[in-house]
A protein has these predicted regions:
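Rossmann-like NAD(P)(H) cofactor-binding subdomain of soluble oxidoreductases
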Residues: 88-166
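Internal alpha-helical scaffold of NAD(P)-dependent oxidoreductase catalytic cores
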Residues: 134-163, 167-207
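Glycine-rich, N-terminal phosphate-binding loop of Rossmann-like dinucleotide-binding domains
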Residues: 82-85, 120, 186
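Conserved N-terminal Rossmann-fold NAD(P) cofactor-binding segment
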Residues: 3-8, 30, 36-79, 85-93, ...
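N-terminal Rossmann-fold NAD(P) dinucleotide-binding loop
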Residues: 18-19
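Aromatic pocket-lining residues of Rossmann-like dinucleotide-binding sites
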Residues: 25
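Glycine-rich Rossmann-fold phosphate-binding loop(s) that bind the pyrophosphate
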Residues: 14
Length: 207
C-alpha cells in the first residue's frame, strides 16, 4: 500500500452526513461528491442546501469539490467514503438496502489499492459480513485487510476503514469539525491513512 497522503477522494451519498463531509474535504483535496439525485446535485452546484447544513460560503470555499451522478468517476478516487443512510423499518430493523446498493456501485467502480471507508451506521459485523463480500464480487478484487502481510504483497485488492458518523442534523455547534472522529482500519497502514485523511478536516482530532 502507498503510504503517501491521499490525493483524490470520493464521498458516496450526499445527505446530512455526506454533504458536509464532501464540502469539508473539497477545501483540502480533490473530492468527488457522488449522488444519484439529480435535483439535489443541481441545488448543490448552485450553492444551495435545502436542509441548511451547508451555506453558500462553504460551497464556494470547497473549490476542489465536484458533484456527479456518474458512478464511473469513483474509479478516480484513492479513497471512497460511503455515507448513505441506514434507516430503521417499522419493526425497528435497519434497512440495509441503501448500503448494499452503494456497496455494489462502489465495487463496480473500485480501483486496485483503494480504501473504502464506511461512515454509515451499522451493526457490529455488518461491514465484514455484508459489505466486503459485495465489494469483492463487484470489483473482482480481493479484500487485502483479511490477509497476512506476506499474502498481501503483489495482490490486486482493496482496503476497508470505518468511521461512524456522529453528526446531529441541525446542530450548528457540534459539527463535523468540532467532534472527535473515531476511525478504524483493517491494517495498521489503512488506519494511519484514514486517520491522516480525517485530520485534514476535523479540528477536534481523531481517535
Amino acid at each position: 500500500m502507498n503510504s503517501g497522503q491521499l490525493k483524490k477522494i470520493a464521498v458516496v451519498g450526499l445527505g446530512y452526513v455526506g454533504l458536509p463531509l464532501a464540502v469539508a474535504f473539497g477545501k483540502q483535496v480533490e473530492t468527488i461528491g457522488f449522488d444519484l439525485d439529480q435535483r439535489k446535485l443541481e441545488n448543490y452546484r448552485g450553492g444551495i442546501d435545502p436542509s441548511g447544513e451547508v451555506n453558500r460560503e462553504e460551497f464556494l470555499a470547497a473549490a476542489q469539490l465536484e458533484f456527479t451522478s456518474d458512478p464511473g468517476r469513483l474509479a478516480e478516487a484513492e479513497a471512497i467514503i460511503v455515507a448513505v443512510p441506514t434507516p430503521i423499518d417499522e419493526a425497528r430493523r435497519p434497512d440495509l438496502a441503501p448500503l448494499t446498493g452503494a456497496s455494489r456501485t462502489v465495487g463496480a467502480n473500485l480501483s486496485p489499492g483503494a480504501i473504502v471507508v464506511f461512515e454509515s451506521t451499522v451493526y457490529p459485523g455488518c461491514t465484514e459480513e455484508i459489505c466486503i463480500p459485495i465489494l469483492e464480487q463487484q470489483s473482482g478484487l480481493t479484500w487485502l485487510g483479511g490477509l497476512d502481510a506476506e499474502a498481501e504483497s503483489g495482490k490486486p485488492g482493496f482496503y476497508v476503514g470505518y468511521s461512524p458518523e456522529r453528526i446531529n442534523p441541525g446542530d450548528k455547534v457540534n459539527r463535523l469539525e468540532t467532534i472527535v472522529k473515531v476511525v478504524a482500519g483493517d491494517t495498521p497502514q489503512t488506519l494511519d491513512r484514514v486517520a491522516c485523511l480525517y485530520e485534514r478536516v476535523v479540528d477536534a482530532g481523531v481517535h
